[in-house]
Amino acid sequence: MFCVQNLPRSSALPLQSFKSHQRRPPCSVNTLGVMSNVNLHRSMAVKAISGPTSSAETSDANVEEEKSETYSTNMTEAMGAVLTYRHELGINYNFIRPDLIVGSCLQTPEDVDKLRSIGVKTIFCLQQNSDLEYFGVDINGIREYAKTYDDIQHLRAEIRDFDAFDLRVRLPAVVSKLYKAINRNGGVTYVHCTAGLGRAPAVTLAYMFWVQGYKLIEAHNLLQSKRSCFPKLDAIKSAAADILTGLRKKVVTLTWKNPDCTTLEISGLDIGWGQRIPLQFDEEQGLWILRRELAEGCYEYKYIVDGEWTINENELVTSANKDGHVNNFVQVFDDNPDSFNANLRKRLTGDDPDLSMDERLKIRQFLESIPDEEQ
């Protein structure tokens, strides 16, 4: 029998805990899901490939296509929407506002020139080193080239790919850095992750919601009218509530009664779909057990039993996404559902959240107070 327990012990982390939180790099990729194509971009900047190609060039192109297909497959399953990224086509982007662009990653130093030509003053990269290495992007070469100009700045603020909880926890520090860069550099800001379909849209939405005065749904509708993408809105909502109420945690215990299996792991929760945590077998109880501190919020997860991904049908299960995938999930609540903080979090994590003038001012002041990260 598998059960979920919310134990009474809890902890509250001060707002300062957001200062420079860094997460581990991801492990390989998730292996569930099916890839499908979607019309992503209404306006694109595409590399032109012309003339005869050698067998080596053809082989390299095939490798790039295979990497893109693998990445798209994993993005589709992790984001819960059918998404495609073609790295071999070059950088692509969309203006969301006259001063804000969301796009895919820079691939060569020449991409810096492309962005300078459209008025970009800040290039804001959300990729981790592992993301760059996967597609063979020379980030150091790009950054060094950008430094040869005095009218554009390249900044990095890493968020782990395919990880909604890392996005939630990192958003305050990342948006703080973006906010300060925009105030300092002016002009047009180019926000990108790898494909420009998850992390970059989410950071841009958080900035529009927290700083520019948009309601979240209004900002999201504007974004979708310019660029088809799938930002994790729940992470943005929870991050806003975390700033205003503090990041409170509770211990959650997951148990599974299956003494016949050899290994039992869990993926999702607060570690993302690219990583796994092993459950420990308690011989006395005959149970596989995992105890983990989780912040308030909703967490999806799956089990890997002797290498096979599965859910427990006796526990809470999400609705099927477009590809038919379902996950288990657990909701972590405040011990006092009638408290001011609980009601504030409930409002901010609802379907159509908005911030009062006072709440938005507090968030801006908090963003300004976060020490600058390197890079």
Swiss-Prot record:
**Annotated transit peptide:** 1-42
Q: Where in the cell is it found?
A: Plastid, Amyloplast; Nucleus
Ligand binding (substrate): 194-199
Q: Which CDD domains did the record assign?
A: DSP_laforin-like, E_set_AMPKbeta_like_N
Q: Name one GO biological process term.
A: starch catabolic process
Tissue specificity: Expressed in phloem parenchyma of 16-24 week old seedlings and 2 year old trees (at protein level). Expressed in leaves of 16-24 week old seedlings and 2 year old trees.
Q: Which terms in the GO cellular component ontology are assigned?
A: amyloplast; chloroplast; nucleus
Q: Which GO terms describe its molecular function?
A: carbohydrate phosphatase activity; phosphoprotein phosphatase activity; starch binding
Q: Where is this region: Disordered?
A: 49-71
Occurrences of domain Tyrosine-protein phosphatase (ranges)? 92-249
Q: What induces it?
A: By cold stress for at least 9 days at 4 degrees Celsius.
Q: Does the keyword Nucleotidyltransferase apply?
A: no
Provide the E.C. number(s) assigned to this enzyme. 3.1.3.-
Q: Where is it mainly found?
A: plastid
For region Polysaccharide binding, the annotated ranges are 254-330
| Cross-referenced InterPro entries | AMPK1_CBM, DSP_laforin-like, Dual-sp_phosphatase_cat-dom, Ig-like_fold, Ig_E-set, Prot-tyrosine_phosphatase-like, Starch-Glucan_Phosphatase, Tyr_Pase_dom
Ranges of biased composition (kind: Polar residues)? 51-61
Q: Which residues form the active site?
A: 193
Task: Name the job this protein performs.
Answer: Starch granule-associated phosphoglucan phosphatase involved in the control of starch accumulation. Acts as a major regulator of the initial steps of starch degradation at the granule surface. Functions during the day by dephosphorylating the night-accumulated phospho-oligosaccharides. Can release phosphate from both the C6 and the C3 positions.
Q: Which PANTHER family match?
A: DUAL SPECIFICITY PHOSPHATASE, SUBGROUP, CATALYTIC DOMAIN, PHOSPHOGLUCAN PHOSPHATASE DSP4, CHLOROPLASTIC
Comment field on protein domains: Contains a C-terminal polysaccharide-binding domain which interacts with the phosphatase domain; this interaction is required for glucan phosphatase activity.
The protein's name is Phosphoglucan phosphatase DSP4, amyloplastic
Origin organism is Castanea sativa (Sweet chestnut)
In the record, what lineage is assigned to the organism producing the protein?
Eukaryota, Viridiplantae, Streptophyta, Embryophyta, Tracheophyta
